Amino acid sequence: MAGSTSASLQTPYFPSSTQINPVRVDHTLPLPPAQPSLSFTQGLLVGQLSVVLLIGAFIKFFIFGEAPPPPSRGLSNRTSTHPRSYSINAASTDSSPRLLREKPSTSNILRPVPSSSTNTRSILRKTYYSATPTHPTPKHGRPRLYHSSHQPESLDWFNVLIAQTIAQYRQTAYILKDSPTSSILASLSETLNNPEKKPSFIDIIKVTDISLGEEFPIFSNCRVIAVEDPNSDGGRLQALMDVDLSDDNLSLAIETSLLLNYPKPFSAILPVALAVSVVRFSGTLCISFVPGPRTSDQTMSPIPTPHDTTSEAIDDQSSDQSSPAQNPDGPKDAHANTSNTTDASSKHGIPKTSLAFSFLPDYRLDLSVRSLIGSRSRLQDVPKVAQLVEARVQSWFEERVVEPRVQVVGLPNIWPRMGRTGLRSSQEEPEAGSGSVEIPVMTSPGTDGVSGGGGSGGGSGGGGGSMRGIDRGLSGREVGYEALRFRHAACGGHQNQSGRDGGRGGNEQFAMPGSMPDTVTET
């Protein structure tokens, strides 16, 4: 029994349908994770340091960073080609450095300006202006002008300034029209009747009509060029600009008489009336700065004493120079002050910088000349008279402001001084503007010879406004700004009527400005 049991244990019985699968042992067991080279503390420190660096970079480049400057006048494109040099502040290489404790001499306190920083090329380089300098190739006695490669300027801002200046001159001339010494009428009459220039066969010239115009000149196409000048080291700069004035009523009318003094004085008298108007003017204006005439060419005044060169004396001279504008009733004092200022400016033989302007010969000046010759049988608009007047005006203009002749004007002293200091407030501007606009209508009695419009309504035939070509219904403000035109005639003579006597009654007759007194006959 025991033997059978052991035999059964050694040889187990398996059913035929049961299969034994072999057991497979996997030897690729997962390895334990590798230990990190940095500890937790070290990683924390590295992370905090990275965050601090990022925050610092953000603050530096985004919060405290400088924004790039906006491009202005194309300076970014010109900086590389026109590097700025500071030759005035830079010390010369051959001179030894001066110690700060070393006391400078009284005659060498002001640092000298190098000639290389004041010549033409240095000025153009430092102002980033491209211009082609000229070469001494004379043409008709003048150096040839080369156009600048720089973009021309429009000069819109300059037109506004010039228009304001001209408008102020027109307003001042109209306000002072009744002044016996400061009016433009008195100045023209004195100039036309100069005994040194007026021939003996011409009678007294009477100004009958003046029109200062309503339009303003338009400047454009400004360019700066370099011109060779033997009187200036390195040449000089010249600004060329186109100017055009058209559709304006700038005119002057006069009347006089031609005297026949043979065989006896005043044997015959031929009345003549002329009216000259500027239809259009266009040309090229040249402006440059030139040194003024030296004292050797002028009448020198005595050398002033040292106390005259102090700041108080200079302030007194500046106040004296502005006194003629404040005191128009004192022409003698104004002339004396002007002469004193001129003498003071020419002391020590030092030339003063002046502004020179002229026009190129290719200008255009169109005139309209109307004439009336005779007393009873009259000739109107004679072509030969118009040609003579136009030729004379053209010659007068060319002899003064056409190249190579220039007009030289001394520059005013613009150094700030307390004598010229003013105060501008918001309350004073409206008052000043209203005060300048209100211009009263100037009337004249019936016996005076003011020509132009007659009285309105029941006014007399000779009385009325002093403006020609303006309706009676205009107020004083409109009269002052419409045309700035006024008339003048001698007292006690016949009045130049325009057919508007006594409230526009009867047939209206018209006459040319500056015509003879009996041009129009009453019906």
UniProtKB/Swiss-Prot annotation:
Query: Region Disordered: what ranges?
Result: 70-118, 295-349, 420-473, 492-523
Q: Which GO MF terms does the UniProt record name?
A: lipid binding
- Please provide the record's keywords in A-Z order: Endoplasmic reticulum, Lipid transport, Lipid-binding, Membrane, Transmembrane, Transmembrane helix, Transport
One Pfam family from the record: MMM1
Q: Which cysteines are joined by disulfide bonds?
A: none
Q: Which GO terms describe its cellular component?
A: endoplasmic reticulum membrane; ERMES complex
What positions does the domain SMP-LTD occupy?
151-412
Q: Can you tell which superkingdom this protein's organism belongs to?
A: Eukaryota
Regions of biased composition (Polar residues) lie at: 74-96, 105-118, 295-312
GO biological-process terms attached to the record: mitochondrial genome maintenance; mitochondrion-endoplasmic reticulum membrane tethering; phospholipid transport; protein insertion into mitochondrial outer membrane
Residue stretches spanning the membrane: 44-64
State the function annotated in the UniProt record.
Component of the ERMES/MDM complex, which serves as a molecular tether to connect the endoplasmic reticulum (ER) and mitochondria. Components of this complex are involved in the control of mitochondrial shape and protein biogenesis, and function in nonvesicular lipid trafficking between the ER and mitochondria. The MDM12-MMM1 subcomplex functions in the major beta-barrel assembly pathway that is responsible for biogenesis of all outer membrane beta-barrel proteins, and acts in a late step after the SAM complex.
* HAMAP family cross-referenced by the UniProt entry: Mmm1
- What is the name listed in the Swiss-Prot or TrEMBL entry for this protein? Maintenance of mitochondrial morphology protein 1
- Organism equals Paracoccidioides brasiliensis (strain Pb03)
